[in-house]
Amino acid sequence: MKQTTVGAEILEPYAEALMSLAQSNNLTGRFGEDVAFILDLLKTSPELQQVLANPFVKPESKKAILRQLVAPQVHDFVLKFLLLLVDRRRIFLLEPICKQFQALLRKLTNTVLAEVTSVVELTEPQRQAVIEKVKTMTGSQQVELETRLDPELIGGVIVKVGSQVLDSSIRGQLRRISNTLTSFT
C-alpha cells in the first residue's frame, strides 16, 4: 500500500501509540520482535491477510484467529493492540502499521535499513560483510538487513540504503558495459 496523506494520517497515530506503549513499559525491543514476527506471519500467509482484510469476516472471527495464531508468540499488550485494530476496523492496515512502527523503532535506535537483493540467500559471513559495508557507507552503528531474491541478477548483490544504491550485480555490470559500448557508436 502506498502511503498517501490519508494513509499517513491513519497509520502514524497507531504506530506512534504502539511505540509510546512500548517505551512507557520499557518493551521496545520485545515489541520490535513481536512486530517482526507479525510481518513474517503476514508475508508467509497470504490467506491470513485476505481474512483480516475481508469486511465480511466477523470481527469476533478475526479476533479468534489472531488469538490462536499470535497470542502464544507476542506480548499481551501487542495482542490487545491487534484486537483494538479489529474493533476499530483498521486491521486491514496491519502490515503498513507494523512497517511504520519498525521505521519509528529504527529512528529511536539509530538503525539504518539496508535493502539487499541477491540471486540466492546470503550466508552469515556474506550478511556480516554487507552489514560492515553499510556501516562504513553510513557511519551507523546498527544495520538492519531486509533481503529479497531476484534470479535475474545472475550473480552479485544490490544494496540500497535510503537513496544510495550499491550495484555489484552481474546484471548491473553487464548493463554498464553495454552502456559504455553503445556510447562509442
Swiss-Prot record:
InterPro entries, sorted: ATP_synth_OSCP/delta_N_sf, ATPase_OSCP/d_CS, ATPase_OSCP/dsu
Record GO terms (molecular function): proton-transporting ATP synthase activity, rotational mechanism
Annotated PROSITE patterns: ATPASE_DELTA
GO cellular component: plasma membrane-derived thylakoid membrane; proton-transporting ATP synthase complex
Membrane topology according to the record: Peripheral membrane protein
Keyword set, alphabetical order: ATP synthesis, CF(1), Hydrogen ion transport, Ion transport, Membrane, Thylakoid, Transport
Location(s), subcellular: Cellular thylakoid membrane
SUPFAM superfamilies registered for this protein in UniProt: N-terminal domain of the delta subunit of the F1F0-ATP synthase
Function: F(1)F(0) ATP synthase produces ATP from ADP in the presence of a proton or sodium gradient. F-type ATPases consist of two structural domains, F(1) containing the extramembraneous catalytic core and F(0) containing the membrane proton channel, linked together by a central stalk and a peripheral stalk. During catalysis, ATP synthesis in the catalytic domain of F(1) is coupled via a rotary mechanism of the central stalk subunits to proton translocation. This protein is part of the stalk that links CF(0) to CF(1). It either transmits conformational changes from CF(0) to CF(1) or is implicated in proton conduction.
Family to which the UniProt record says this protein belongs: Belongs to the ATPase delta chain family.
Oligomer status and interactors: F-type ATPases have 2 components, F(1) - the catalytic core - and F(0) - the membrane proton channel. F(1) has five subunits: alpha(3), beta(3), gamma(1), delta(1), epsilon(1). CF(0) has four main subunits: a(1), b(1), b'(1) and c(10-14). The alpha and beta chains form an alternating ring which encloses part of the gamma chain. F(1) is attached to F(0) by a central stalk formed by the gamma and epsilon chains, while a peripheral stalk is formed by the delta, b and b' chains.
Protein name per UniProt: ATP synthase subunit delta
Organism per entry: Cyanothece sp. (strain PCC 7425 / ATCC 29141)
UniProt lineage: Bacteria, Bacillati, Cyanobacteriota, Cyanophyceae, Gomontiellales
